[in-house]
Amino acid sequence: MHDKERMQELWQKMSLWMNSYMKSFYSPEKATKAKSHLEIKSAKTIFFDDAQIVDGIILKEKHTWKVTHNCEQLAKHLRLSEHDVMLAKMIGLFHDVGRFYQFTVYRTFNDALSENHAKLGLKVIADLPFMQELSKEDLATLKFAIGNHNARVIEATDNKRYLSFAKLIRDADKIDIYRVLKPYLAPTDGTGCSPDFVDLFIEGKQCDYTKMRTQDDRKLVRLMWVYDINYAWSLKAIVEQNYIEDIIGKLSHDDKMMIGINRLRKYIEEKLATTDVWEG
């Protein structure tokens, strides 16, 4: 079997499993057919009649397919081989697999109040037989990318392939998170942003998400993300939906904040003018 056919066949197995797995958290019929190792058959961990659980699961189900699509489109933009485009889709497919068990058990997507969903996801897929159909290098790449997709910074590595796929999934994920969060974007409640967050924003740095103290801190974190976007293609997708300016419009604009906002706008203009290069 040619590599293209092998990867497509493997993709079919993975996508069918993932589709069934996601639906098993809110579909009784699907749950009865679930594998025992998924640990979702117990009445203590499954809530078909709980609107909060069902809404949260469906939200992440849609997010999963959106991110998978983003991975595919970004991979094609970067002119990856057909093999690597398929690998990028697989990473997108499983990047948030830990979210479903997390939300059902803990009723939160907040890792600080539950478990690191990336690490939880790696546990969920660890024993899936079809994972062994990937080459050792591809499997290691997939695990590294998923394990680092939500990290503040990517784990140090000399492996350019690991690093490049981690960058790809982080971009694909962020593009859709902006979409997910947009309906919840509200005007400033007057509490403002924490001074240390504003300082980091002005410097173009990332922050420790666990230290967010106000609603405006959360908005500022989304603006700081721009400096962590790896490809101009990704940033263009975000800017075209007006996500950045929408967030800016919901913050107070004192002199210090405007320094950060003006720097951000200049950075965006410069980043969009760059050419994307795949280094993996």
Give, region by region, the residue ranges found by the protein language model:
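Acidic/His-rich, divalent-metal-binding segments that scaffold phosphate/diphosphate chemistry
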Residues: M1-K119
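Acidic/histidine metal-binding catalytic segments
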Residues: R79-M90, F130-G147, Y162-L168
